[in-house]
């Protein structure tokens, strides 16, 4: 009888140990799956606003900064003002920019500006991102699409010189993106449209579908892949665009 009880106890202990091990394995598996989707550190994808380094689109409003009071000069506080165009540096184009009665920048939904985004690397030799070029990349299941182009490779968002030969989104690619229902499109120079285009068709196609365009992203240190994206433009009532802070963090899968 004692032997039977001893065997029974050992069997119960063994079952308990195996059960605890299985629970631990399941917990570890859940943690591993969770950690596999944990984003890494934040990357600042915002170009610094500085008259010495910020490119201004040809014909757009110049940028100026002025200190009204300066503690370095003996004042009791430091106080400044600045003047710049709505499309300076990293900024967001709202539908109102090219769509009559389109939403102004203060009415662009946060759901469009925050969420998963895919960064696509466009070869340095490519200036026109047309439908054929777009379809060379895996973009169709992306909620938001951002293009890293020659502008990042050449550091153009840190140069005050305006470069006309920046890479742009061709209208046929814009149509594909709009038809696919992407929530946001981003580029790494101060316009998504070809310089000197006879008509702003890329803007009209995207903004006409309510898709905000983020222009002037600083992507020099950003690699192709999937990211969490947060873009927060200034909440300016009734205007067509505004400078924004943009941050990203890589999704590790």
Question: What is the meaning of each model-derived region?
Answer:
Residues 11-21:
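Bacterial N-terminal signal peptides
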